[in-house]
Amino acid sequence: MFALGLPFLVLLVASVESHLGVLGPKNVSQKDAEFERTYVDEVNSELVNIYTFNHTVTRNRTEGVRVSVNVLNKQKGAPLLFVVRQKEAVVSFQVPLILRGMFQRKYLYQKVERTLCQPPTKNESEIQFFYVDVSTLSPVNTTYQLRVSRMDDFVLRTGEQFSFNTTAAQPQYFKYEFPEGVDSVIVKVTSNKAFPCSVISIQDVLCPVYDLDNNVAFIGMYQTMTKKAAITVQRKDFPSNSFYVVVVVKTEDQACGGSLPFYPFAEDEPVDQGHRQKTLSVLVSQAVTSEAYVSGMLFCLGIFLSFYLLTVLLACWENWRQKKKTLLVAIDRACPESGHPRVLADSFPGSSPYEGYNYGSFENVSGSTDGLVDSAGTGDLSYGYQGRSFEPVGTRPRVDSMSSVEEDDYDTLTDIDSDKNVIRTKQYLYVADLARKDKRVLRKKYQIYFWNIATIAVFYALPVVQLVITYQTVVNVTGNQDICYYNFLCAHPLGNLSAFNNILSNLGYILLGLLFLLIILQREINHNRALLRNDLCALECGIPKHFGLFYAMGTALMMEGLLSACYHVCPNYTNFQFDTSFMYMIAGLCMLKLYQKRHPDINASAYSAYACLAIVIFFSVLGVVFGKGNTAFWIVFSIIHIIATLLLSTQLYYMGRWKLDSGIFRRILHVLYTDCIRQCSGPLYVDRMVLLVMGNVINWSLAAYGLIMRPNDFASYLLAIGICNLLLYFAFYIIMKLRSGERIKLIPLLCIVCTSVVWGFALFFFFQGLSTWQKTPAESREHNRDCILLDFFDDHDIWHFLSSIAMFGSFLVLLTLDDDLDTVQRDKIYVF
């Protein structure tokens, strides 16, 4: 058997030797080389050049070594392979270096520079050798240049700025070591020009270092950059108490918002990029200390807890004032011999500010309808109470319906309901006409607002919290800091959170929302006590007290704080709807509350109101996903916006006394014919018409703006529609209140003035624009700025502080605006 197998073995050995002779080199040239010397040599498939370098490595001094290679022959054949063999690492690269871009584009680089990874040494000092092998499979000679040099500025120092140049084939990285007592630093990299696009990476001191465009994202933290980048680094994340700052220029600029270069038609043809060099500066500075975190949290708590203290002081003052008022009333009642009782400011004086007005009176009203509508006598339809008696509450008979209608006119609630078309279509209405329903029924109706929004909050918030935690986990695991749009120059991490300060600043919404709920609870308790003791002012005077919408508003403010904090865990394009959803809720609830004040019986139910808000949020999601540059979407949305505006205008103008059915167009034509063609008659409800015309002008203008401009930030555009309508209605309400002869008391007046000022400052900080997800992450970082408050909070944090205070103040305005009517009979309070 052995004799038979021997010829085959000899044949196999001969075959291997022949292959080695063809594939392997015949000559190996090994030479001792020196630093800072340029070697110009040739290599081919028959020759391998090996350069031997040695240098002294010390424990306390880190020295960088850089290898520069330039191939002088421009050939498309076999490239040169450079292999650097070190004690604990091997680096290999080919020249010309080919890097891939999008769509597998090829970019070729003749000149390549690489920094060698320096493994740490345990000895005090030792001599280390490394070898540079140069080989190729090209049969012809290829000339190249080789130079190995030391890097004197390889180690970065705290507070010292260092500038350098880099290209895609000549990446740079530097080492930073944490000084004693420093637990966190921020690495800032800047450049005077935006392009070429570059990548900044923070990697642990390990070999190999990933410093090429095609592998820089494999490890560590990284972010793209145009002119500005910043990464906060914590000592606890690096066991060696040091890290590498890696700077890589990308082959293409699309990741930074740039355009793709021209690509040749020849298949697989390399692209000549020309001179894509970028000059950058790196600065490592100490980040904030733990004392800054403590002071930031104490400052945040101090600001908003002071509102609690101020509320307690005002409550004590109001309690003292009420006790004093009660005592004076008791003294007056105990001294009837004085001839005339003491008249209090909050009682019904004979010369009240409402005397002399007859807003909305009818001419020639028969005696049978005197109880239904207050008569003004001689046909003067101007505002005022001329010729009207203004009897004290105590002298009027109580009616369960709390209206200006005499009990003899209506027998049952069913009769009243059957006459809605008569009551609600009068030319001039009073609150008593729209406050006929049972108080207990209305109370339950408006409490549903609170319970519904609480349920919505739970079901909406839980998946949001889960999602943003997942986003933060992905950022921490992958190191990709382009996922979230922070203000990286003022992003202070805590635990797993990357920007704790942006989350902390939302605490104001939660604390002030809770405070508003406590204020509403106290008001409701006081009102219920007044009802229990049959206080006639509570029963028959002022705007009917329904607190359900106020509870819903306070809950919405708290949820806005929670969801805004969730959004700022990882702010980006897809998460922004979390920040705006409850803003839509707040705007809608405020408008409903304004309408409810004068229309308590005909306000929208909680189910229909939240259904409409759900439709708004639905369109918000559609706009975020499909609205960017989509003309068809904007056409459909603008049409729906205009139709919804017209339907709501009709509903408000006719107080709900109209029907949307098949005969609607016939009725519209009939009204146009009778009121516009046969005779030109003005609108029956002038004030409502003025409001609705202004509202339609604004909404049609916003619809036209959206259709023409098609803004990228659809969620903010939708929010602007809600805010504009709310401000319009708010201004109309205040103007009509003053026009009706009503007054604004001191506390709501102060709230209006202070809230307006705070809103002005808040909007100033909001429009600073520290980041924007409408651009690429690299472009967004160009807007980043340093902290401006306590070295801990930035402009957007101040927006959170001020806007939460402004929203709280706006809620207080809604709560106290009609306090001057608390002693005015409801049949003397106008509806507008």
Curated annotation (Swiss-Prot):
- Membrane topology designation: Multi-pass membrane protein
Q: Does the keyword Glycoprotein apply?
A: yes
Task: Give the signal peptide, or none.
Answer: 1-18
* InterPro entries per UniProt: SID1_TM_fam
List locations, semicolon-separated. Lysosome membrane; Cell membrane
- Where do the record's glycosylation annotations fall on this chain? N27, N54, N60, N123, N141, N165, N476, N496, N572, N603
- Key words of the record: Cell membrane, DNA-binding, Glycoprotein, Lysosome, Membrane, Phosphoprotein, RNA-binding, Signal, Transmembrane, Transmembrane helix, Transport
Q: Name one GO cellular component term.
A: lysosome
Give me the segments passing through the membrane.
297-317, 448-468, 500-520, 547-567, 606-626, 632-652, 689-709, 716-736, 747-767, 797-817
Choose any GO biological process term that the UniProt entry carries and state it: RNA catabolic process
Give the modified residues of type Phosphoserine. S401, S403, S404
**Residue ranges, Extracellular compartment?**
19-296, 469-499, 568-605, 653-688, 737-746, 818-832
Gene Ontology MF annotations:
AP-1 adaptor complex binding; AP-2 adaptor complex binding; DNA binding; double-stranded RNA binding; nucleic acid transmembrane transporter activity; RNA transmembrane transporter activity
Its post-translational modification remark reads: Glycosylated.
Cytoplasmic face residues? 318-447, 521-546, 627-631, 710-715, 768-796
Q: Superkingdom of the source?
A: Eukaryota
The family assignment reads: Belongs to the SID1 family.
Q: What does this chain do? A: Mediates the translocation of RNA and DNA across the lysosomal membrane during RNA and DNA autophagy (RDA), a process in which RNA or DNA is directly imported into lysosomes in an ATP-dependent manner, and degraded. Involved in the uptake of single-stranded oligonucleotides by living cells, a process called gymnosis. In vitro, mediates the uptake of linear DNA more efficiently than that of circular DNA, but exhibits similar uptake efficacy toward RNA and DNA. Binds long double-stranded RNA (dsRNA) (500 - 700 base pairs), but not dsRNA shorter than 100 bp.
Q: Could you describe the subunit structure of this protein? A: Interacts with adapter protein complex 1 (AP-1) and AP-2, but not AP-3 and AP-4. Interacts with LAMP2.
| Record protein name field | SID1 transmembrane family member 2
The gene coding this protein: SIDT2
